[in-house]
């Protein structure tokens, strides 16, 4: 649509600026965290861990539908206790395994949204990621 090329270019520039600001917010917001360990239901947030120097501990590995073994739950439980982790994270909605793990370990259950199923159409990528940042900051003990 050549007639609107100028508007598309302006929109792209605006989005790039917003994404760069979001990246800076994550870098600045996570650099003072007392914990660098991110315990999640699965490793969907590996990209986030790499980008912001966090260690990912996935309870179920990569596949969110995979059954978690007792051995893996014991391994994660040991890491949480040994590292003094205060919050583990699950996706929005009910995740019985993560809630049970949080209860057994007496830690908080935080929420991280991987944007798989957009529940609220008013929430765009930037808003969801800002909410994720706030959840991470609270759960990882950031100043």
Language-model features, listed with the residues they occupy:
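Extracytoplasmic metal-acquisition and chelation regions
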Residues: 1-143
């Amino acid at each position: 649509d050549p007639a609107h090329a100028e508007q598309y270019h302006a929109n792209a520039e605006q989005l790039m600026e917003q994404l760069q600001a979001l990246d800076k917010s994550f870098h600045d917001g996570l650099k003072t965290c007392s914990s660098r360990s991110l315990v999640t239901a699965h490793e969907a947030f590996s990209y986030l861990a790499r980008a912001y120097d966090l260690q990912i501990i996935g309870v179920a590995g990569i596949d969110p539908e995979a059954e978690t073994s007792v051995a893996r739950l014991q391994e994660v439980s040991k890491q949480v206790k040994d590292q003094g982790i205060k919050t583990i994270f699950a996706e929005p909605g009910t995740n019985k395994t993560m809630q049970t793990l949080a209860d057994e370990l007496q830690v908080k259950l935080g929420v991280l949204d991987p944007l798989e199923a957009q529940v609220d159409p008013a929430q765009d990528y930037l808003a969801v990621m800002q909410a994720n940042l706030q959840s991470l900051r609270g759960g990882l003990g950031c100043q």
